[in-house]
Amino acid sequence: MLYIDKATILKFDLEMLKKHRRAIQFIAVLLFIVGLLCISFPFVSGDILSTVVGALLICSGIALIVGLFSNRSHNFWPVLSGFLVAVAYLLIGYFFIRAPELGIFAIAAFIAGLFCVAGVIRLMSWYRQRSMKGSWLQLVIGVLDIVIAWIFLGATPMVSVTLVSTLVGIELIFSAASLFSFASLFVKQQ
């Protein structure tokens, strides 16, 4: 999700943003449409999402290998470990493209892990700050995060694909809304 506050906006050149206002709005419309498509067609968008993530993993693996050999030092172990990570990226990316169903399940497991970690962190935060006013919200959000992680992990394959596609669709729609509000800050003056 895009997070843009006043401090970020002040760092941008105002004239440059006014020139690119239409492009920002166009990207926002595309994000909104893709978000709606992800929610409307979860299985097709799940396959596409897995393929895109696989392609990005392959590009990352290639970039890591190129970076290793162009910037290598005389230390053997960092180069070897970086090469092994690059090979892992390439293999995982290949499997994401070759078997999109497995890729989307891996994405679902990763998202479940993120929710679980976030839930544990929120619960720890609540426990440390339980005497403070309003700390109960940390408890509620932490429990909800763990419940969402459990739903992701315990879901059937069809539900898992639907959950991931819906989550990505909602995220894209919120990013589109954020870009629309960002673009509306820079109205062209006649």
Swiss-Prot record:
Keyword annotations from UniProtKB, A to Z: Cell inner membrane, Cell membrane, Membrane, Transmembrane, Transmembrane helix
Coiled coil: none
Residue numbers on the Cytoplasmic membrane side: 1-25, 71-76, 127-138, 188-190
Cellular compartments annotated: Cell inner membrane
Primary location: membrane
Secretion signal, residue range per the UniProt entry: none
Membrane-crossing residue ranges in chain numbering: 26-44, 48-70, 77-99, 104-126, 139-161, 165-187
Regions of this protein lying in the Periplasmic compartment: 45-47, 100-103, 162-164
NCBIfam families noted in UniProt: PRK10209.1 (NF007577)
Protein name as catalogued: Protein HdeD
Organism: Escherichia coli (strain K12)
Lineage summary: Bacteria, Pseudomonadati, Pseudomonadota, Gammaproteobacteria, Enterobacterales
